[in-house]
Amino acid sequence: MAINSDEQQNAALSWTKAVTKNKEIVAENSNRLIPKGSKLNLKNPPRIKRKLSAWKGRTDRQAFWLKHNLIKKTLPGEAGEIFDELKMARAEILGSKEYDGAKLNIQNFSIDVT
């Protein structure tokens, strides 16, 4: 069965809104791995079904960032990038404790990125 891009993107956006309890989240096509504001960065889903879990992992980690990123402070330069990665790791850990399927998706995303 072929992957329906629109259905997958709508499902990812709906799931993110439900997890975060924020109906104001919107999707944008961006390479950003960390969401900015209330924007979920969605790329087109892969055409290969075995890569779908990694694509979902990219979405899951952003959903958890939007839900658990309570520290709004930013730092300049490289220190800010490191701080954001630490905040993302925290969000992934907290979210993965709630959703086992998302934990697997995030692991697949991490493998796919490296």
Show which residues each predicted segment covers:
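Basic/hydrophobic alpha-helical interface regions
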Residues: 1-114
